[in-house]
Amino acid sequence: MRIGFYPGCSLNGTSREYNESVKAIGKALGIDWVELKDWNCCGATAAHSMNKELSLALPTRILALAEKQGFQEIVVPCASCYNRLSVAQYELENNEKLKDDVLTVVGLPYLGTVKVLNVLQFIEKYILDILPDKIVRPFAHQVACYYGCLLLRPHKVLKFDRLEDPQSMDKIMSILGANPIDWAFKTECCGAGLSVSRTDLVGRLSGNILKDASDRGAEAVIVACPMCHSNLDMRRSTINRHLMEPMTIPVLYVTQVLGLAIGLSAKDLGLKRHFVGVNLKEAELCQE
């Protein structure tokens, strides 16, 4: 199965383990990832508050390249990239003058024919039906499915899942053998946009997320966003100072959990790249 793939910047940098796990499950399940050629950064910064035209030109060029290279849909694992590409599609569909201005900057034709899928949509569409027969090591743990902001908001643009109580990741985890908890912070912001400028706020926001998950019995927090993973995993010392207690709960990408359940190795899934060790029996069983 040949599927277009846009990694974005994070999957080649701070979230290499996400990239590795996406590629690994694809290989194991017969998916031929075809990376978009000549891709650029999607502009997932605060640029949209300074220069709207430029902030739309960057993701529009990606979409135009996908059309030019013959893709009808592309999988975008990074939630921030998924958000920016989807917002660009929405803005151009609803404002012809803006579309003309942006395409003048981009210098490529764009028809709006490419469908953008986040990683949860991809799993639901291409993997979910075959998944039960592929599981060799059920992920039998209590988990907190954390969606964050960018997969869901703005909801009028993304139209993905339920805004207040999304269920797509919960459904995937249940099939993998996990028990998703009911908790209050599954769509709260982790403070990713402030991860450099206001680490104190990141400590509070991310700390509240981990504290609630841990207090409700979760053994792991599951994410589908590189920014969320970086804050919840990498900022653990800041979080611990805010909470005044150590948080040892690991944070895994949904693709890593899927990979563990179908028998892939810790190396294939990039588990050693985490700041907080993944001390779960499934991870220990697949160290080879």
Please provide the spans of the model-predicted regions.
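Iron-sulfur cluster-binding electron-transfer modules in prokaryotic oxidoreductases
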Residues: 1-288
